[in-house]
A protein has these predicted regions:
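Alpha-helical transmembrane segments of polytopic membrane transporters and translocases
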Residues: 28, 38-56, 219, 250-268, ...
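Interhelical loop/hinge segments that connect adjacent transmembrane helices in multipass membrane
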Residues: 1-5, 172-179, 192-231, 274, ...
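Specific pore-lining/lateral-gate transmembrane helices of multi-pass inner-membrane transport
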Residues: 67-84, 253-367
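Signature of the first transmembrane helix
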Residues: 3-61, 89-99, 120-121, 154-155, ...
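Hydrophobic alpha-helical transmembrane segments
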Residues: 115, 145-198, 368-373, 387-408
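Transmembrane alpha-helical segments of multi-pass transport proteins
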Residues: 105, 370, 419-434
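Membrane-water interface segments that mark the loop-to-transmembrane alpha-helix transition
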Residues: 7-19, 45, 50, 54-101, ...
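Helix-terminus/linker motif at the lipid-water interface of multi-pass membrane proteins
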Residues: 24-38, 104, 225-263, 278-281, ...
Length: 434
């Protein structure tokens, strides 16, 4: 059993991390083929897609796992979750498509980009429960194959469209059009591959069970909204607060250099995948607090090294990830974004206290506080510092979330962190990175 657990964890890890590595290739392709204005448009719309994915799944994936492991109503849970998401997604598709012109006018984007965005959000929502079903059934290989296949197909289509399609066609519709077209095709292919799961589960709806699942899912939805705002809405605020003629280009250079933080993100994601199951499995061990402290210290040491390494060799990494010099003006933000993501990773490590003590609502509260800070500091700093203000707002937000979790964690579940060692190492990493 343990052997299968480790194998599945490794496979799910690959399915999570490998697509993110592939997106690095997409970033290089986009900044090579798109000007800063077009890349800014793509990045701005993509933020809304992230929020849309959260809203259209409304925490149902987490509720699915919780209720599948709770009782004997497994078939009812499967069919209720699938029916709920299918009906709500198709309803959204109908309403959003009818209002597509109004949405495009309100957001100030081309209508074809908005339509593609609607399709992508709906297609992604329709595969939430099929993917959850695969994980619940232990079909890790198929899960990883479809996840990686989706990203690989998207990458291949992007390479074809932007490199080999007639340049006259790209000039007529814009490169952003073909980026979203590739995403729609890849998402549609994923849905087609997973359609047999729809047949296995069947459509039935149990209202009383659905109400219970929605009550459980609501805090997850709030935390998801907060995450989407914290992670990407600085682009929305940049477009809102900067002059219209320069906003998209500024978002473009900011988003490209922001991608340099992906190395820290990959490290944090891998850490979460590996350590969260361990946190729960060792919660009853009398030495658990000491173990948690040691794990956090190791994480900070490794994260500090990544911060220092990427910052020192930024001039090398920019040639790999951002070969277009037009985007280099925003490289100033790289150490700030790396440090912000390190703070977020430390926050995830510190969050063990409310997970093992069943105070999970605290996570939603901290995320909402972070969202409020994101909004406040973006509005305060962007008019003054432009994209530098957006980067600083991200650092302040994640730093505050980390500090709040540490403060309350020590009150409710004291963990003997070696504060002096952490301060010295983290301080030295920051000092030599700026």
């Amino acid at each position: 059993m343990l052997k299968k657990l480790f194998q599945d964890t490794a496979i799910y890890g690959i399915a999570t991390v490998l697509p993110r590595v592939m997106t690095l290739l997409l970033t290089r392709l986009y900044v090579s083929k798109l000007d800063t204005n077009d890349f800014g448009i793509y990045s701005g719309i993509f933020v809304y897609l992230i929020l849309g994915n959260v809203l259209l799944s409304y925490g149902m994936e987490t509720a699915f796992f919780r209720f599948m492991n709770k009782g004997e109503q497994k078939k009812q849970v499967q069919s209720t979750a699938l029916t709920s998401l299918t009906v709500s997604s198709l309803f959204f598709l109908l309403v959003a498509y009818l209002l597509r012109e109004s949405i495009a006018s309100w957001l100030n984007y081309k209508i074809e980009h908005i339509v593609f965005g609607i399709y992508i959000m709906v297609l992604d929502a329709l595969v939430v429960i099929p993917f959850a079903w695969l994980r619940n059934k232990g079909k890790a290989n198929l899960y990883a194959f479809v996840k990686v296949g989706n990203t690989a197909l998207n990458l291949a289509l992007n390479i074809y469209f932007l490199n080999y399609l007639y340049q006259e066609r790209i000039a007529a519709t814009g490169g952003v059009y073909y980026i979203f077209l590739a995403n729609v095709i890849a998402s549609l292919a994923t849905l087609i591959v997973l359609l047999p799961i729809y047949i296995k589960i069947r459509f039935r709806f149990y209202y009383s069970l659905w109400k219970e699942m929605m009550i459980y899912a609501f805090p997850v939805l709030l935390a998801g909204i907060a995450f989407a705002v914290n992670e990407g809405f600085d682009r929305v605020f940049l477009r809102m607060l900067l002059p219209e003629e320069t906003a998209d280009a500024t978002i473009g250079i900011y988003s490209a250099c922001y991608k340099m933080g992906v190395f820290m993100n990959l490290f944090v994601s891998a850490f979460k995948l590996g350590v969260e199951p361990f946190f729960f499995s060792s919660a009853q061990d009398k030495n658990a607090p000491k173990t948690y402290a040691r794990i956090t210290e190791y994480f900070i040491v490794c994260g500090g090294f990544i911060l220092l390494f990427i910052t020192v060799f930024t001039d090398v990494f920019k040639l790999i990830l951002i070969p277009n010099k037009a985007y280099w003006d925003a490289l100033w933000i790289v150490p700030i974004i790396l440090l912000a993501n390190l703070c977020l990773g430390i926050y995830h490590s510190l969050s063990v206290w409310y997970k093992v003590t069943d105070r999970t609502s605290f996570g939603a509260i901290v995320s909402l506080i972070g969202m409020a800070l994101t909004v406040f500091f973006n509005f305060a700093l962007i008019p003054w510092l432009s994209y530098k203000g957006a980067a600083l707002a991200t650092l302040i937000t994640y730093g505050a979330m980390m500090s709040i979790s540490y403060y309350y964690g020590q009150k409710h579940y004291p963990i003997p962190y070696n504060k002096r060692k952490i301060k010295v190492f983290l301080g030295m990493s920051i000092l030599f990175s700026f």
